Amino acid sequence: MKYGSVCEKGKRPQNQDGMLVRMDSRYMPLAAVSDGMGGHLAGDAASALSLQILDENTRCMNIAPQDMLARAYVLANDAVLEESHRDPYKDGMGATLVSALFFPDHFIAANVGDSRLYSFKQGVLRQVTYDHSYVQELVRLGYITKEQAKHHPKRNLITRCIGSSDGPFETDLFYIDWKQGDSVLLCSDGLSGVLEEEDIQDILSQPYSPQIQCEKLAALALKKGSTDNITALIVCNDEEDTCS
């Protein structure tokens, strides 16, 4: 597998996004993106802790991968919640967390929040994850359109996050087949919130390396007016330098 990544603060004074790529042959390959929230001190701490707990708890080879991934999310939620209670400066902190464990012919994805995972197969982009957000619920119920959601005053309000104490914690899990030449994009809403799917598909269709694809996506997001941190992480099921 090949991968590339960009994680930058964009037009924000501080970067509260985080990302993780684990390609250690001793463990299952893992990729993840987390977008922290909770103020100057807390946002980056929430995303960093979420990724740390995810990494530490997805290394066991004796547990069904989907169960291990779901358990890691619960532990990450507990850890972020505990830290927010321990440190008054981090009160109310939280984070999104989207991730994927990779296997030769499939991957298992998990998501909480509005960071996204897209699959790209044979020139076609598909959003795999479902945004846990207020506006996505309005779209699902038919109250607003996808286009209206982009400009809604509550478009940044998420309904699930790592660090939540509201009711039973739930993680969305997805089992997706993938073949040689397929790729996966994990990103924060600093990217997906401003780029159309056609924009992303066009760049992933070009014969660039995953790193160049990520850089082009981030540059286009800035050009289109992103005011948030921007993270793009592409994993390609290919041994070649390019992926398309």
PLM features: residue spans?
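PP2C/PPM-type serine/threonine phosphatase catalytic domain
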Residues: 1-244
